Amino acid sequence: MSTQEEMEERLLREGSDAEGQSNNRESIYLRTKVWSEVNKMWRIALPSSLFRMTSFGSIIVAQAFIGHSSELGLAAYALLQSTFIRFLYGLMGGMSSATETLCGQAYGAEQYHTMGIYLQRSWIVDMAVTTLFLPFIVLAGPILRLLGQNVEITKTVDEIYPWMIPYVYSLIFTMTIQMYLQAQMRNAIVGVLSTLSLALDLVVTWWCVSVMGMGIGGALLGLNVGSWAMVLAEFVYIFGGWCPFTWTGFSIAAFVDLIPMLKLSISSGFMICLEYWYMSILVLMAGYTKDAKIAISAFSICQYIYTWELNICLGFLGAACVRVANELGKGDAHAVRFSIKVILTISTLMGVIFSALCLAFCGRISYLFSNSDEVSDAVNDLSVILAVSILLNSIQPILSGVAVGAGMQSIVAVVNLASYYAIGIPLGLILTYVFHLGVKGLWSGMLAGIAIQTIILCYIIYKTDWELEVKRTCERMKVWSLKPSNEESNPIIREESRSK
């Protein structure tokens, strides 16, 4: 071999080695980037899911103790909870997502001082809206009687509703504070506090009902004690100096620009309410099918399974919202796309796992709620539809979270309205009463609505110009931003700026 050939061969080997090293570096960089994104996602999603599951657990604790105290009380509590309280819970959850959008984008844009202002504005707006809807809770009994509900049950509702008013007002603070802390990656404390509040709720409820014999009032007292204990603990955390960059005290600026905040909050609340009420309407419709008792029992059990899984997925919704809002605030459209891909992949994989578990154990799980073999068979018959619903449920909330993070609540609300109520429910009615498919027909209609909603949201997000969304976010931050009067004199803020 000539010297020239040896040199060419050596150069080829060196080029190949360099290319291999470059590919290896790119692979390591990608793995590091994915792991970093997954870590950020779980830091948000895990405490958020825990908060939602413990909040739902508080409702279950009250229901369980009331059920052991009075069957009539259980029926009244379930009726009030599944109608007016569920509506307000969905409304507060939706309106608080406006706080999540604004605080997330402000945190990404490093406008930390505005986050506390947004939180205060959300308290004002949510308090006003809750007070506006309060007469519906006060008049829940008469309204339900006008709708033809059992008189004896609705009279018990009249005795229960005063206990629910403090609980509803506690939601204003717990939900908005959760979004505020979540936007700045401090929501681990929310998971801890929500777990402790559930434990306190359980202890107080047990003491009031089992030891003091307070019955329904004792169960609802425990619910309020647990809820407000969490609110007070969150106040201590925020006001006590654990959020030095984002909470600088109460400000008169909170009363400025309330109309834009109200518009965003209402569109957010409308978006979530449509989803919360969808399942409730289907449960009510199940009562008019053949073998209504079995149908309602089976559908309710499936609803419990669906709701537990939904609470986990809503944690991913929060993660998607915060990550998208943060990166939009930073002005990084590429990072937005990357975050969406990672969160969607993880959530879909979890959906596949949950769906498989549902298919394998759904019939057995039903025995946790009922000893009836007929109910178990009915639940097992619905397991395939439930599994598909769970799979779609692992995708749709992420897409909604992305839309919320970008401030597209109004668009999602319209999509939800069209998918659920213009397509899903009418189709379910046709399958039930025309084709006589019973509960399976109802759920199939719901499934069609969710599938259509998912497809539309996928298309909207796929076609979204994220560079344009970055510009819109920057413009929104300029319009809504407030210059901190003490920025130059505040060593904490100066230190935060240097670290960035």
UniProtKB/Swiss-Prot annotation:
Family affiliation: Belongs to the multi antimicrobial extrusion (MATE) (TC 2.A.66.1) family.
Gene expressing this chain: DTX24
Taxonomy, superkingdom: Eukaryota
Pfam families from the UniProt entry: MatE
Annotated segments matching region Disordered: 1-20
Record-linked CDD domains: MATE_eukaryotic
Keyword hit for Heme: no
Keyword terms, alphabetized: Membrane, Transmembrane, Transmembrane helix, Transport
A cellular-component GO term for this protein: membrane
Name assigned to this protein: Protein DETOXIFICATION 24
Compartments it resides in: Membrane
Alphabetized NCBIfam families for the sequence: matE
Membrane-spanning segments: 48-67, 72-92, 124-144, 160-180, 188-208, 225-245, 266-286, 298-318, 342-362, 384-404, 411-431, 441-461
Record carries keyword Transmembrane: yes
Biological processes annotated in GO: xenobiotic detoxification by transmembrane export across the plasma membrane
GO molecular function: antiporter activity; xenobiotic transmembrane transporter activity
Membrane topology: Multi-pass membrane protein
